[in-house]
Amino acid sequence: MFTLKKSMLLLLFLGTISLTLCEEERDANEEEENGGEVKVEEKRFIGPIISALASLFGG
């Protein structure tokens, strides 16, 4: 059971990293298309990650 939880945690972590990288690339492409206009957007990933970790290891 612990191995399954570790595997799921690893998949969640890698998925979050790849999603972040894709969003950064998309934002860079949008910035190039808009002529250098910068759009600031704050992303908050830590809350869902902490709750997922708590549910995996807590019960």
Curated annotation (Swiss-Prot):
GO cellular component: extracellular region
Main location: secreted
Domain of life assignment: Eukaryota
One Pfam family this sequence matches: FSAP_sig_propep
Keyword line: Amphibian defense peptide, Antibiotic, Antimicrobial, Cleavage on pair of basic residues, Secreted, Signal
Tissue-specific expression: Expressed by the skin glands.
Species annotation: Rana dybowskii
Protein name: Temporin-CDYe
An annotated GO BP: defense response to Gram-positive bacterium
Pro-sequence residue ranges: 23-42
InterPro entries found in the cross-reference section: Frog_antimicrobial_propeptide
Entry's family note: Belongs to the frog skin active peptide (FSAP) family. Temporin subfamily.
Function: Antimicrobial peptide.
Signal peptide interval: 1-22
Subcellular localization: Secreted
